[in-house]
Design a protein with these regions (language model features):
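Long, low-complexity intrinsically disordered regions enriched in Ser/Thr/Pro/Gly
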Residues: 1-444
Length: 444
């Protein structure tokens, strides 16, 4: 694996996979800095942390998640301090550990009260380390302090109706998402509702029920996709519903979808809006106003939702992509003040108007006023500004060096983290005899 510097042509680093040298790693990403790289080896044998500045490597055995689609659920970096937390599994038991922000040595490791934990995450202020249990084990989210001590356990929503009296017997947490401001946590399960928890109290504050039939109101926008066939190809537009509509369900024609439908929830940059999708209605995006606990908008497409994400800095700007060959090279962008979702057709801007391989779409963290998208395929990429035609020219035409931050990840803004101000690196007084032998470290 090679590491190149975008500003220094003569820089090149080479990393060799010591665990499985003849096999490709399943997951690679940068760590807390540009000189730190995380890598999962094939078959989940090792989780490796490479330090390019010192040419040192630390290996952690038996990471619980190693496949590309789920590896990021198994580890987390604490905002501000850079402490590293990871889930491993040995002899059928979950083990969590917190590592030093510089040396990555174990500060504490313990066995959480889980049967089959499905992920962990820090809150943006770094005050809590969250872990959630498998859906098969019911509703359970653990709120741990930064040094790994259990503070509180959320055991599911309280039944609000008579028909929900056996709610605790159903499947539990399917998806857990923390808001950018750290004040709320959205919890999706196998029902048609989303629970929103207050982080400070670790208690449920609201429940968002997805209705089977949506009635248009002044406060609710319902946009339905329309596809027209022209000589130049398909044209995608959206019309606002004036009558009650039902979200399309899953296809029942016996065909197998390219990807299974997913239940997801994502907060916008202001933490005031929450976008959700459900397995039962895979082609619909729901947008909720958390201040009023009401539905703000419903976006109905003709194809299953592939992905959606809010702009990392600008509030209330949502990007959606859909499954299918007909949607390759198409991106839809919505905001509450627009006249329906905008269609960005970037396939026509690529060479030969073809998408090679898997289409890619992500936000750029641009310092200008207009939102900017990075679009492309496996060979070509382009930038697209969402500024109106009457506005100024494309923002990059007058840009200077260092005006653009090429990032599509989370905002890693330095935050105050008082919970670790008095963190004692010397944990010799803790009893870790039962779990220390589950970690294997190798320095090179």
């Amino acid at each position: 694996m090679s590491v190149l510097h975008t500003l220094c042509d003569g820089y090149r680093g080479v990393i060799r996979n010591p665990a499985t040298p003849n096999l490709k790693p399943t997951f690679v990403q940068f760590g807390a800095s540009d000189t730190e790289i995380f890598m999962c080896s094939s078959y989940g044998l090792k989780f490796s942390i490479f330090d390019l500045a010192t040419s040192r490597t630390i290996e952690i055995s038996n990471p619980k998640f190693h496949q590309a689609s789920v590896a990021s659920r198994g580890f987390a970096l604490r905002p501000g301090s850079g402490h590293f937390a990871i889930l491993t599994r040995v002899a059928g038991k979950d083990i969590a550990s917190v590592h030093h922000p510089k040396t990555r040595q174990v500060l504490r490791s313990w066995q959480p009260d889980t049967v089959d934990a499905q992920g962990l995450a820090w809150t943006p202020d770094g005050r809590w380390l969250l872990m959630w249990e498998s859906a098969a084990q019911g509703h359970k989210i653990l709120f741990c302090t930064p040094d790994g001590h259990l503070f509180k356990t959320w055991s599911g929503p309280s039944p609000w109706a008579i028909e929900e009296k056996h709610y605790e017997l159903g499947a539990g947490v399917k998806h857990c998402q923390v808001s950018p401001d750290g004040a709320r946590i959205a919890v999706c399960d196998h029902t048609r509702s989303v629970c929103v928890l207050e982080t400070k109290s670790a208690a449920e504050s609201m429940r968002l029920e997805h209705p089977a039939t949506i009635a248009p109101r002044d406060t609710v926008q319902i946009w339905q996709e329309e596809i027209a066939t022209t000589q130049s190809g398909s044209q995608h537009s959206f019309s606002r519903a004036t009558q009650s509509v039902s979200a399309p369900g899953r296809a029942s024609n016996g065909t197998v979808d390219t990807k299974p439908a997913r239940t997801l929830s994502v907060f916008d940059a202001s933490s005031s809006l929450l976008a959700t999708t459900l397995e039962d209605w895979p082609s619909t995006v729901w947008v909720w106003d958390l201040a009023s606990s009401e539905l703000r908008a419903v976006l109905i497409f003709h194809s299953q939702i592939l992905a959606f994400s809010w702009h990392p800095k600008q509030r209330e700007v949502l990007m959606v992509t859909c499954e299918g060959d007909n949607y390759a090279g198409l991106v839809f962008v919505w905001d509450p003040l627009s006249d329906g979702p905008k269609t960005v057709h970037f396939r026509g801007q690529l060479p030969d108007a073809k998408v090679l391989g898997k289409p890619q779409a992500s936000w750029l963290d641009w310092t200008g006023d207009s939102a900017v998208l990075l679009l492309g395929d496996s060979k070509h990429h382009l930038m697209a500004s969402l500024a109106e035609a009457e506005e100024s020219v494309a923002p990059w035409q007058d840009a200077h060096r260092n005006d653009l931050t090429m990032t599509t990840g989370k905002d890693e803004t330095q935050m105050e983290a008082p919970a670790l101000d008095d963190f004692d690196d010397d944990l010799s007084g803790l009893d870790m005899s039962e779990v220390d032998d589950t970690f294997s470290f190798k320095r090179t």
